[in-house]
Amino acid sequence: MKKKRKMGFAAAILAMVLLFAGCGQTETKTESSTAASETEDETPVHVLALKGPTSMGMVKMMSDNDSKESPADTFELAAAPDEVSAKLVQGEVDIAAVPANLASVLYNKTNGGVQVLAVNTLGVLYIVEDGDTVQSVADLKGRTIYASGKGATPEYALNYILEKNGLVPGEDVTIEWKSEHAECLAALMAEDNAIAMLPQPFVTTAQTKSDKIQVRLDLTAEWNAIQKDSDAPSQLITGVVVARKAFIEENPEAVSAFMDSYAASVDFVNANIDEAAELVGKYEIVPAAVAQKAIPACNITFIVGGEMKQALSGYLSVLFEQNPKAVGGAMPGDDFYYAE
């Protein structure tokens, strides 16, 4: 499993701002709680997650809570980052799974009132091709990439990877920005050897429409290759889990219990793809058939503590250097990173 839980001090949180694979326009709710026999004093927790890879790791925890006799904790799935932001800032939810840069934006907006608990999703961006001409980043020179997410994290991540490989975006590589992933797919299917940057699970959806579409570059792996010799390597991060700082301070045991349950849920999802995919479909995140193929490529993880801080702060620094507004105008302070 891609779980790295920090206990004590060792290596042991939906933007975009945008979550690259947000799906649907309806909100789904599921309520759950611990049975009264477990403890009468347990604090109910209200959790909100953005639909897509950022919420996929929660599905086992959601299912377990639904099966309890006396539901009290509440899980919601939202279609848009703005909905998550508003409810978190207004105190309507306690914990939320959001795009990584949105967490920093919320931290700045609330004057430090939000903390990140864990990284829950690494990169989900892929270079795909209707052909077989791209084997490395260098092969993108002189080519056109169809992509969506201009002025948001997909653009900044792509620019970073191109530049670190000696390519100048807009000069060595043409990037044709589209408003939606579906437009990228249409362009991809209309040309021979066309190239696009797409997120999971949309990559999987695209491949169901054309068996000619193949993944050529995993941008998470390309980011890691750039960082491999760094003294403090960052990672390409899609989603994190955050909580209101006041809730953390007032309910440390509830937060700790949530973290334990979430870590176990991520474990289950990565180890039991078929069962997890059925749950993803049940909660209408994406269809089960899509989830079954997409989960292994969604980089669902659970990284906390010092490793989380190093990976996330480095990622936010890359965004900040290209556009400070992408992280809320300023890099978050040390108090942004939760530590048990």
Per-region residue spans from a language model:
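Bacterial N-terminal signal peptides that target proteins for export
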Residues: 1-10
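Short, solvent-exposed loop/beta-turn-alpha elements that line the ligand-binding surface or hinge
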Residues: 65-71, 222-234, 300-309
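Secondary-structure end/capping motifs
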Residues: 248-322
